[in-house]
């Protein structure tokens, strides 16, 4: 199993706007080979931002990689730049291979 995460620093006071964008978006993940699930999680607040992370699980790293090169990925991310005023910097990607679990 592979876990893909993007960390987002969201401008303080824009959290609800950010969450609304995520709730209303078209993911285009239904039926994508190897996709298991997705969560958006909210973390700690800092002086100027609130930390969020997107968390998706995939059958393998290759399944995730294939999705990032797909038309479904391009369509799902085509409007990502429209909300840049909500972010401090760019998202930070982290990928993890699951080595143990319950």
PLM regions with names:
Residues 10-12, 60, 97-100:
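Non-catalytic surface loops within mature trypsin-like serine protease
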